[in-house]
Amino acid sequence: MPTRNIAIGGVQEEVYHPNALRAALAEFISTLIFVFAGSGSGIAFNKITDNGATTPSGLVAAALAHAFGLFVAVSVGANISGGHVNPAVTFGVLLGGNITLLRGILYWIAQLLGSVAACFLLSFATGGEPIPAFGLSAGVGSLNALVFEIVMTFGLVYTVYATAVDPKNGSLGTIAPIAIGFIVGANILAGGAFSGASMNPAVAFGPAVVSWTWTNHWVYWAGPLIGGGLAGIIYDFVFIDENAHEQLPTTDY
């Protein structure tokens, strides 16, 4: 099983080393960039429509903002931290044995803080406009949303593995960030009208903290972590040769 490759890592190397701190800072900045663009697009839509109902054009705009924002966020962080920008991606990569536990926890902290910082900056920059928190649409139950988040995040992390983690790929340059941005945009078009299509606990956490809205917040942790974990385990176990498996450098996924 892939979990055979999980390593805890040394505190000195994975927490206090300058390279680890640089990687954590890169995750903080990349997540801030992504959440600022994604949540900012939602605030802009509410401003333009005077908090009107979500429209098809609004959903498309949200999908594009998140796809473009994630493409940039992953690209600028890829050579430093791997550009995870998502605790679910970090969790999936951890279960596949491609990052140590301590480095994963460090990334999680950086990602969550980056999201919170982005939302506080948005609140200040917009003059106190409400920060839209993730929530379920009318008629959508928590279990329905949970399945949506599991499936969508599975697709996202599977894409990360196929384009960025799998050692058979070599260097794909900008193809991996583009593919990752595309799958997020496509999933928002599919699930945005139901669960909000978070696929990322950090993306849901920042708005929840700033708006102090926690209703069904567990869905946006459980779903992405289950989906991301399953994708990491399945891809690593089925498609990556065990004999060729090795811990990736900390500058990669």
UniProtKB/Swiss-Prot annotation:
GO terms for biological process: hydrogen peroxide transmembrane transport. Its main location: membrane. GO terms for molecular function: mRNA binding; water channel activity. CDD domains: MIP. Widely expressed. Predominantly expressed in roots. A motif (NPA 2) lies at residues 200-202. PANTHER family: AQUAPORIN TIP1-2, AQUAPORIN-8. This is Aquaporin TIP1-2. It comes from Arabidopsis thaliana (Mouse-ear cress).
